[in-house]
Amino acid sequence: MTPSALKKTVLLLGTAFAAASVHASGYHFGTQSVNAQSTANAAAAEAADASTIFYNPAGLTKLDSSQISVNANIVLPSIHYEADSATDFTGLPVQGSKSGKITKTTVAPHIYGAYKVNDNLTVGLGVYVPFGSATEYEKDSVLRHNINKLGLTSIAVEPVAAWKLNDRHSFGAGIIAQHTSAELRKYADWGIKSKAEILTAKPPKPNGVAEAAKIQADGHADVKGSDWGFGYQLAWMWDINDRARVGVNYRSKVSHTLKGDAEWAADGAAAKAMWSTMLAANGYTANEKARVKIVTPESLSVHGMYKVSDKADLFGDVTWTRHSRFDKAELVFEKEKTVVKGKSDRTTITPNWRNTYKVGFGGSYQISEPLQLRAGIAFDKSPVRNADYRMNSLPDGNRIWFSAGMKYHIGKNHVVDAAYTHIHINDTSYRTAKASGNDVDSKGASSARFKNHADIIGLQYTYKFK
């Protein structure tokens, strides 16, 4: 793989795929409120606290006071892989580790504030994590020539306003300013040319395969990039009667152009010896600029709440997400690069994602005046069609959420929420063919199987200004 190949694939796949998290399908982080998490995110129509800013900002008109809500989610993802096969561009087996865990525990904070201007108008501000992911393989993994390390964090800042038209109807709107930063590592096999010369020698060398297999000349690049993008949110909430409420929330797409630089390193003596020769022969610079455009998708949520009694409430939510926006991605470089079949300044991938839906149901029961118990279940559809479109850094699959939690009032001003979620994720598999030669990527074919699940622990504190 040429230096351009590595850098190009790194930035493209890192930024395009990093937005996925093990505990939410596609790009989404999964939960932005512990109060919502306790019902598997089914309680958007409840509008229990200032975190309604994310799920339905029209719900701000339902709050009984100005307040601030601070949330923390501890995410314990578990992705274990087992490689079935991995060959380089010449067809020789890749040497290295064939199994392991590629995730670590992460913490995501969210904070919301609401201010009641008057009985009809409430304004608020949310700072939350809408998208995030982190996976890392062993540096000697046989899948290292695909993606070795992946990390992305998006932080959104959203001012909102909610207006109560009358006792039944409320409307809300927000402007989303989203900052996304990405980090990725990918390895390249710089010994491909030497291997190919040995394997295609005329007459054939008696021990050609064994000789070629001994050539280990990997290099790698670490890439970081960031960008601001902007979107909006629109919401409506309708109290049908004293027991039933429905809501609709729309979150727009957010477009990003992430730009980055690769920091190169040669691994081992053989790769270091090839470094200057490869750069000179192919006309590459060590820190060339590159860009890739990605779009985080819009979503539409319809949700409801029904008061069964003075103590019991039921919740439901259906969310549709336009993941099909991510059907193609291109990374464009400043200069054309020499590739196997000519020249190219870009790499194109076609993940061909499909639109998805998530369905959730939940409920709450008031045990005593200060204590409420909550629970929920949800089905979350994956946008990945099959193993041929799945990335090794994104082993996404259909998932089921099982959530439970509690809410405890301490006097008139303090509220504490706690929640636990276990996410069952279908076992998945991954297949990729070797690079076509039309771009600068020279990875070989590989396949792997994944066993995935996740657990989330949430803690939330709300202070009401009364």
From Swiss-Prot:
Signal peptide per UniProt: 1-24
Disulfide bonds: none
Keywords: Cell outer membrane, Membrane, Signal, Transmembrane, Transmembrane beta strand
Membrane disposition: Multi-pass membrane protein
Keyword Transmembrane applies: yes
Pfam families in UniProt: Toluene_X
Subcellular location: Cell outer membrane
Protein name listed in UniProt: Putative outer membrane protein NMB0088
